[in-house]
Each structure stands twice: as C-alpha cells, then as structure tokens.
Amino acid sequence: TAHQAGIQVIEITGDCYETALAVAKEAGIYNDGDLAIKDEDFQKMSDDEVKEIIHRLRVISRCSPNTKLRLVTLAQEIGKSVAMTGDGVNDSPALKQADVGFGMQDGSDVAKEAADIVLTDNNFASIVKGVELGRTFLHNIMMFLEFQLPINFVLLIFCAIYPVVAANAEFLAPVQI
C-alpha cells in the first residue's frame, strides 16, 4: 500500500464532505486521528497553519483548483516531493506544479497534456507499484556499485603497484586494458 511505502496520500476532491470521508476510509487513506476538512475551512487557514497540519491532513472536500495548487505548492515548500493525480481540466494547474503529475487515460486532454505520466489503466495502485519498482531498481544499482567499486579499486591499485615490484613488467599490458 501507499502507506507501507511511506507515501502520504491526501484526497482532494470536489465531492461533499461526507462522501469524501467515506471514500477515504474505505480506501485506507483516512484513519482515526487524521484530519479531514472542507475547502472553505482550508481557505481560511494561513500558509503557516496549513504547513503545520499537512502531515495529518488526509481529505479536503469541495475542493477548488486554487486549493489543489496551493496545497501542492505548500507541500513542496516544506520539502515534500509531491505527486498529483487528476483527470479534469481543473486539475491541470496542480498537475503542472507537482514534482510528478499523473493524468488518467480516461481524463480530459488538458489534464493528460499537463501530466508528466499518463496512467493507461486509470489505477492509482499503478503509482505505488511504480514507486516500488523504482526503489528496487535503485537498491539493485547501489548493491552492484557496493560490490563492483571496491573490486575495481583493488585491481587499479594492483596494476599501479605491480610494475614497481616486478622491475621488467609493463605499466599496463594490453591484457590489463
């Protein structure tokens, strides 16, 4: 799940508060102790207040395009990497502002154009799977380098010292290159 991967999911929707909260609970986004607010309450908050609550925020209902853009911008200001999903014209400013914008295949052309990546299966779980694959790939590269660099360093030192020890040896023989 996104939570297990260390990804904080915030549902920003045009749905009414009750519907948004029910969807968030069913999807595992919202738990006890988390924060769900209406757009009108979000608009009344200062930027500093939003930055203080953003780690607990899980749902914003009746959301406007300006709220989506503001939330993305404020999350970036506190150092979060932000991915945004959207399928409507109203999502395009936030999709462009986000570090990674995910459009939906069945979404509007404007949203797909604003997005960095288009999810052809329209499935949020594809993002989590992509993050998992990316982290696995990075881990494998790091493990390869952790193994390969010391070996290559030792061989380089050996190639530099051997000609000094063996007086008649070439510095780098064709076989060594």
Segments from the language model and where they lie:
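Membrane-embedded transport module
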Residues: 27, 31-84, 98, 103-177
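Short intrinsically disordered, low-complexity coil segments enriched in acidic
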Residues: 1-8, 177
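Short active-site oxyanion
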Residues: 6-10, 57-59
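Exposed boundary/loop context
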Residues: 7, 79-81, 94
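Hydrophobic "anchor" residues on beta-strands that sit immediately upstream
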Residues: 11, 82-83, 87
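Acidic, divalent-metal-coordinating active-site segment for phosphoryl/phosphodiester hydrolysis
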Residues: 1-4, 16-27, 66-72, 88-98
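Alpha-helical substrate-recognition element adjacent to the catalytic core
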Residues: 8-11, 18, 33, 141
